[in-house]
């Protein structure tokens, strides 16, 4: 479990985080040669409920900010402990960003952490331009990359591409499942790829055995 009590955070936030009993697992993201690892995506694994249940509960109580802080601090701590050298991909709510005190605490505890980070903007719950401005300042100062998660779902559409100008776009599996036998999907994906590549963006496909079975 992540030792949140050791992190330099407000007592209220620490108390909430300590009660979550969260661990993190790391899913490798490969280069297109399917051999070399490009990044590790930190995936939250709460002990007492599913991730979806946890997010729904905190969204209902308007406390998603706590999960945002938990993910950045907890995932970074777990990543460093594992000794990984590849990029660390951290999920981030589009409606949240660090406070000034939290940003300072992050730098104090972990160092400046320049480079080797990818902030992956989730497709829910809602987009906040104010929070994105604050988040983008941190991203630029630290030379981090921005990834758009599950493009084609929720808030992550072309408007999000225009707003975030991400370095990486991850296509949602709904866009590609069954694409071999679906001319419309083929044309849609081709159009998206051309648009992303024209903007110098990389495209990532999340491969799973289920997706392979459906394709």
Predicted regions and their residues:
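Flexible, glycine/charge-rich interdomain/linker segments that couple
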Residues: 1-7, 87-92
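Active-site core of bacterial EAL-family cyclic-dinucleotide phosphodiesterase domains
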Residues: 2-57
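Structural preference for beta-strand elements that scaffold enzyme active sites
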Residues: 23, 87-89, 116-120, 145-147, ...
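Active-site beta-loop-alpha junctions enriched in small/polar residues
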Residues: 29, 93-95, 122-124, 151-153, ...
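Conserved, mostly hydrophobic/aromatic
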Residues: 35, 71, 119, 150, ...
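Catalytic core of bacterial c-di-GMP phosphodiesterases, primarily the EAL and HD-GYP domains
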Residues: 65-134, 144
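Bacterial c-di-GMP phosphodiesterase catalytic domain signature
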Residues: 98-105, 129-130, 151-201
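Single conserved hydrophobic/aromatic residue that forms the stacking wall/gate
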Residues: 207-215
């Amino acid at each position: 479990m992540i030792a949140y009590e050791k992190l330099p955070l407000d007592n209220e936030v620490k108390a909430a985080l300590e009660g979550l009993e969260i661990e993190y697992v790391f899913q490798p993201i490969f280069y297109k040669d399917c051999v070399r690892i490009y990044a590790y995506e930190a995936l939250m694994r709460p002990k007492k409920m599913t991730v979806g249940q946890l997010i729904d509960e905190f969204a209902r109580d308007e406390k998603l900010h706590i999960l945002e802080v938990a993910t950045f601090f907890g995932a970074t701590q777990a990543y460093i402990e594992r000794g990984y050298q590849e990029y660390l991909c951290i999920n981030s709510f589009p409606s949240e960003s660090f406070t000034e005190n939290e940003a300072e605490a992050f730098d104090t505890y972990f160092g400046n952490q320049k480079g080797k980070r990818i902030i992956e903007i989730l497709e829910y719950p809602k987009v906040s331009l104010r929070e994105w401005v604050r988040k983008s300042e941190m991203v630029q100062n630290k030379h981090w990359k921005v990834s758009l998660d599950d493009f084609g779902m929720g808030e992550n559409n072309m408007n999000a591409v225009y707003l975030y100008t991400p370095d990486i776009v991850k296509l949602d599996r709904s866009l590609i499942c069954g694409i071999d036998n679906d001319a419309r999907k083929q044309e849609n994906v081709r159009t998206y790829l051309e648009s992303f590549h024209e903007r110098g963006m990389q495209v990532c496909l999340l491969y799973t055995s289920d997706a392979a079975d459906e394709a």
